[in-house]
């Protein structure tokens, strides 16, 4: 099973940390396992509480049902159903910017 280095960043929240997450663990679960508290609500990809923005790298969020193609094209990802597919950098706490 492959594992990837996932860098989580957010200046306002004073977050800049890199954690290792395997390809079968969501980014939200990987963060929680490493003691990083990120916002969430449904844990099923049907709301926007956990939305982040992929700055660099590849992810799989095919299980999500909330974001439209335009939002995903801008890099937004629901971290509760997003799996790393490469080393990546993700801005956390992005719900206010989703509009």
Swiss-Prot record:
Its cofactor is [2Fe-2S] cluster. GO terms for biological process: electron transport chain; heterocyst development; nitrogen fixation. GO terms for molecular function: 2 iron, 2 sulfur cluster binding; electron transfer activity; metal ion binding. Keywords: 2Fe-2S, Electron transport, Heterocyst, Iron, Iron-sulfur, Metal-binding, Nitrogen fixation, Transport. Transmembrane segments: none annotated. The keyword Iron-sulfur applies. SUPFAM superfamilies: 2Fe-2S ferredoxin-like (SSF54292). It holds the Pfam family Fer2. Residues 4-96 form the 2Fe-2S ferredoxin-type domain. Binds 1 [2Fe-2S] cluster. [2Fe-2S] cluster binds at residues 42, 47, 50, 80. Ferredoxins are iron-sulfur proteins that transfer electrons in a wide variety of metabolic reactions. Donates electrons to the nitrogenase. This ferredoxin is expressed by heterocysts and differs from the ferredoxin expressed in vegetative cells. Belongs to the 2Fe2S plant-type ferredoxin family. This is Ferredoxin, heterocyst. It comes from Nostoc sp. (strain PCC 7120 / SAG 25.82 / UTEX 2576). The lineage of its organism: Bacteria, Bacillati, Cyanobacteriota, Cyanophyceae, Nostocales. The gene is fdxH.
